[in-house]
Amino acid sequence: MKKVTPFLWFDTQAEEAMNYYVSVFKNAKVLGVSRGPDGKAFTVSFELDGQEFMGLNAGPQFKFNEAVSMFVNCEDQAEVDHFWNALIADGGEESMCGWCKDKYGLWWQIVPKQLGELMGGSDPARSMRVVNAMLKMHKIIVADLQKAYDGK
């Protein structure tokens, strides 16, 4: 196990969520499931693109919120589309600026690497146009960021 591992509290869906996340990420695997006397999953562990996670079925006392999100750094628009569409499916929700909530209530930021590249340029006016364009988006669209950067 890595030194720091996100630990996710679920009501009863830890195993279901783990299997879902493993299906969404191409480089992912189940690491283990520990079961209680009733045979139901108590804790789960899995890996998404080299990042280990643990999950716990512990009841409805705590819910996920926007204070903690999983940041997915995407190579291109196709990858943004893949993660966005998969994570909002079956009851997930879109939010602004590349944020979305999956059907288990976990928050994600689906961000193309181009956003940082375009915002980090040496021309503050161009960077501000990119920021202003992004602030109007739900899912981030790379082509629209580029248009804003170019002043179109």
Residue ranges and their predicted role:
Residues M1-T5, N65-S69:
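Short, solvent-exposed beta-strand edge segments and adjacent coil->beta transition regions
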Residues P6, Y21, F46, L87, ...:
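Terminal peptide-recognition signature
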Residues L8-Q51:
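Core segments of cupin and vicinal oxygen chelate
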Residues A14-E15, K63, M70-L115, G121, ...:
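Vicinal oxygen chelate
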Residues R126-K152:
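Acidic/histidine-enriched, glycine/proline-rich intrinsically disordered or flexible terminal extensions
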Residues K29-L31, E52-M54, L106-Q114:
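Active-site-proximal beta-strands of protease catalytic cores
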